[in-house]
Amino acid sequence: VTIGPVCELPKEVGGPCRGHIIPRY
């Protein structure tokens, strides 16, 4: 499940998006 716009890195790993989480495992 992708929340918000597609980001290169999720916030959990210091991504450029605020409050956006993308599953990259």
From Swiss-Prot:
- On the tree of life, the source organism's domain of life is Eukaryota
**Where does the protein principally reside?**
secreted
Instruction: Extract the GO molecular function terms from the UniProt entry.
Output: serine-type endopeptidase inhibitor activity
GO CC field = extracellular region
- Localization (cell): Secreted
Q: Where is this site: Reactive bond?
A: C17, R18
Q: Which residues form the BPTI/Kunitz inhibitor domain?
A: 6-25
Q: Which UniProt keywords apply?
A: Protease inhibitor, Secreted, Serine protease inhibitor
Q: Where are the transmembrane segments?
A: none
Q: Which stretch is the leader sequence?
A: none
Function noted in UniProt: Inhibits bovine trypsin, human plasma kallikrein and human neutrophil elastase.
Q: Which protein is depicted? A: Kunitz-type serine protease inhibitor 2
What is the scientific name of the source organism?
Rhipicephalus microplus
